[in-house]
Structure formats: C-alpha cells, structure tokens
Amino acid sequence: MDLSINEGTLVVTGGPGDTPQNAIVIKKTPRGLSAAGAETMLLGKWFGERGRTWTLKRQEMVQLEGRTYDTYDVVLGDGSEKRLYFDVTDWLNLMAPARC
C-alpha cells in the first residue's frame, strides 16, 4: 500500500499484522514522519479516532529473529483487543547513518 502524503510517500507492505510472520512492513515514510507516526496514522485509518473508537493499551519495540517490530496492543470500541506487529527493520536501516 502506498499512501501519498505532503512530503513524500508512505510505503507499507506485508500482511495483516496479526503475527510477526505476517507483520505490516513500514518500508518508507515521508520526510519528517517517523515509523511510529506512520503506525499511529494507519491505526487511525483502520480503526477510527483514537480515544473514541479505540485506545492504545501498550506499545513496545521487540527484536525477534533478527528483525525489529513495533507492537501495538489496542482495545477496540466493542471491548475486543487486538495486537498488531509492524516490522520497522528496513525503515530503521534506511534512517541509520552510513557506515564508513
């Protein structure tokens, strides 16, 4: 999924994010938008307004099998809970300064 935003394109690939193996992959964000900012924007697009139709229970960064994931535990308006995995490995590598 590519979403055009003012200063570039948000590039997201992968699966539904229900497991690390099917993680939502943040490949690229527009200038000035962090991976976490992109993730929050996507959560709002999928679930609606934060604090109204969903709330964030917990967010953490985890390392699994050499990949880096942002995990979000959200509580939806009906009381159900959902955990989403965002793979930010490629984004972090893009943002890392070049090594000499």
Name each model-derived stretch.
Residues 1-42:
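N-terminal trafficking/processing presequences and adjacent post-cleavage segments
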Residues 6, 45-46, 79:
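Low-complexity, intrinsically disordered/propeptide-like segments
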Residues 46-55:
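Short secondary-structure junctions
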Residues 57-100:
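Short, compact, well-ordered microdomains
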